[in-house]
């Protein structure tokens, strides 16, 4: 069985004078600070769009609440109000062209999971407005709140196509549930593209609430600019001398860091002869490949 590598959520911070988005691709490599002379290499597993905005405040309010009238959210018993501002007050939302924003739900695990369920399963609709009394809000359906982390391209671990994708999701969830604590707010461009202000209010109308969350939800429960990362990377291992004295040979990733590196999987294997030629490429025992010598 392959060991499960170290995982974490990393947060990127935008410079205050930034006036445009910054795209961080999946697979972006990071290195930790050295501990006892050794650092760890990580790579991000999902693409990230970093926006020069911050969450000014967040509040969950039950009935009676003050919010724009939303005809798509009849029967709402609570509303989550999120207030965003640009890092630079001189930058307007209309200059950014922001259509989607990713939120990471953090804090105590029990509260974060409860809030995730509330937003993912009990949102009736969304309103984008200037203030709670805005008479002309932009209304979005509940589908504007989207779960993140379940797509194959967002996998923490490389996964063979022959294996059921659900097993990977279960492995990742039980080993690192924080990977799935992300939600996207989509369709924001309907408001932000014409928002000549550095302030934007987002209202999520809910058909259920929690007295405990109403007391505890604030801006600290959300984080922007976050993405999962995993301590897993490709590397050519040290050559193995075949002396035919044993049936097992140790695969050593890096002789200089033997105590802090570990093999997760072997993706390819080639024979190299003394003259430097490499006539044979070995396939995996379970590979569906046939080599014909014609």
Q: Where in the sequence are the language-model features?
A:
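Intrinsically disordered, low-complexity boundary segments flanking structured domains
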Residues: 1, 66-70, 113-114, 186-192, ...
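Extended assembly-interface regions of large multimeric machines
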Residues: 1-133, 137-142, 147-149
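Cytosolic catalytic cores of cyclic-nucleotide second-messenger enzymes
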Residues: 294
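Exposed low-complexity, polar/acidic, P/S/T/G-rich flexible segments that act as propeptides
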Residues: 208-278
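Extended, solvent-exposed segments with strong compositional bias
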Residues: 144-183
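Conserved small/polar residues in nucleotide/adenosyl-binding loops
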Residues: 283-290
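Ser/Thr/Pro-rich, low-complexity mucin-like regions
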Residues: 183-223
